[in-house]
Amino acid sequence: MAQVVFSSWGRTIVDNRKGGEAQDVSFRLPTTLDGERQIAAFMGWDGIILYDLKVDVPAMAAEYMKRVQTQYCCGKCTPGKKGTKVLADVLAAIIEGRATEADLDTIDDLADLLTNCKCTLCQSSTIPVLDAVKHFREDFLAYITGIRKPANVHRFIDKYTAPCMDRCPAHIDIPAYIEAIKEYRFDESLDIIRDNMPLPSVCGRVCPHPCETHCRRKNVDDSVNIMVLKRSASDYEWMHNAAPPMQPKPQKNKKVAIVGAGPAGLACAYYLALEGYPCTIYEALPEGYGGGMIAVGIPPYRQPRHLLQRDIDIISSMGVDIIYDTRIGKDISLEELKQKFDAVFLAPGAHRSKPMGVEGEDKGYKGFLKGGIDFLREAYMGRPTGMGKKVVVVGGGNTAIDCVRVALREGAEESTLLYRRSRKEMPADVWEVDGADEEGVRFEFQVLPTRVLVDENEQVTGVECVRMALGEPDASGRRRPEPVPGSEFVVECDTVIPAIGQDPDLSFIPDNLGIDITKWNTVVTKYVPLKDAAGKDLKDGMGNPLARVLITDLEGVFAGGDAEIGPLTVVACIGNAHRAARVIQRWLEEGKAYLTEDELMEDILTNMPVYDKNEKVPWLDSRERAHQAEVHGQERASKGNYQEVELGFVDTQAVEEAERCLRCYRVAMAAI
């Protein structure tokens, strides 16, 4: 187990350099980069963490500031451009033995100057340098007096991030694309977005925007409307009939098969096609329904289908072939794909509804529908849904909310949602719940269905329920619902739609092929084992291994999206698939599947808290967050009305909202 030798991280000093009884401390920083190579030290926006006393802290500080100045400083303000240059030069002079002790005081003065920078990249970069000078002053003096020379024992790896980037599953360079919008360069903004997001019109509309929960502007007044700014860049290209500028590399002779044309499959194909690899996507749905769960799971009033199709057409134009109406395991086997292609990426999505577990659900009653995902798919494809006039949906996630809202648009006279916890504890996005409320959906909270009621013709007539009281928190942190004795009651209805979750259908994977499946019905992939200083395995926010390589135990077969980790958001599927595409490329070119140092650093930074909700952000002006125009009133949910509800920004509104961004970049560097 590694020991923290010194740390100033989080403004708390831990100093074990003199030996003796060590302070027991741990961080979410792994002790190795890849399970083998030790991380000896780490410098960043919140200080220094030292695992190895042999690390040359002055030399590391000098290299850190050199990289900040030459690689990351934007040069758009004088304090940043000049201040970082002088500071880097002073530190270099110290390491080269050309400085005096007075130069250590100059470092303090330069740090004060950098507090006037237009963004926080240069400001935050002074923190580890000042900590180094303060707590390792004797080491700096040893360089100044000529006693010490650079040992060059360690190699340094750097990476930049921002609180919003760190929280984005696709790691889009959010400050950069917002900066471009601020300068009315919408086309350049979209280029930046597409570096990590090939479905911008989709994620500009349906993304749950976790980035906004970590926006430092929120510490001043309210977060920047990051999602709608992304939509603004995409809408600008569409409304101006501009051609996307992507230019794939010359086509290579190795081919990739992709199972599923959902967000993960499309994203993987996009990034491989950019590198020149021919990709063939096999999609079970018919032509016209590319996009997977976006096409048959997300309502058109949230995501217009013509804009989804535009994103898909752009990907197809890069040489990606999508074969529709083809089910793997039925029309073509996975073994055949393995033989015909050099690599296979499994991204079938999660289209199988979970059972409710109530009495009568397996009897085939009229009006008891198979599941929420199935109901939505039939509705969007224009098929009979089997829905009546009084609809009950069971669940509390976004799919359940989509079902109650779509039921109204399909002609339901009453649409009711039953959820076993409180409104506050619903996993659905708050704005989607509010939208359902506005459209006239009826909610029954803290209610658990126990039995489906039917008449003599086996037609559903209602659901027997019991009231629930919220007890102690469970493993998810939410209070556990417990039945209230004697509280049984009936909700009258003619249709019941269970929408309590969905799973991938992996029945197309033969048992004898060598691909392992978890007890959660997801594909097992390899990962890099990372532990912190306390020996604890580091995992992501969903409890999965932090640094996943996305290759299965079957050589040349990879998995991503819902199939690899369970139901994910669109943006999480895309981030996952982008990583898979890079790993697949290395597999095709080198015969090895691994994560690069840059990718490992990306995972490490994601695991460390870049955003501090308690930070006091000094900012003089307070400007209200811009909200996009929206169609209001119950008439927007009238029968057959799938017109888009949220209308986006006009260009000037987007520019004004972009000006609220504080450009909160951070630079981190590890000694290996």
Swiss-Prot record:
Gene3D superfamilies: Alpha-helical ferredoxin, FAD/NAD(P)-binding domain. [4Fe-4S] cluster binds at residues 203, 207, 211, 215. This is NADPH-Fe(3+) oxidoreductase subunit beta. One of its GO terms (molecular function) is metal ion binding. Transmembrane segments: none annotated. It is an enzyme of class 1 (oxidoreductase). FAD binds at residues 254-283, 552-562. It is found in: Cytoplasm; Cell membrane. One of its GO terms (cellular component) is plasma membrane. Signal peptide: none annotated. PANTHER family: GLUTAMATE SYNTHASE [NADPH] SMALL CHAIN (PTHR42783), GLUTAMATE SYNTHASE [NADPH] SMALL CHAIN-RELATED (PTHR42783:SF3). Heterotetramer with 2 alpha subunits. InterPro entries: DPD_II (IPR028261), FAD/NAD-bd_sf (IPR036188), FAD/NAD-binding_dom (IPR023753), Helical_ferredxn (IPR009051), Nuop51_4Fe4S-bd (IPR019575), Nuop51_4Fe4S-bd_sf (IPR037207).
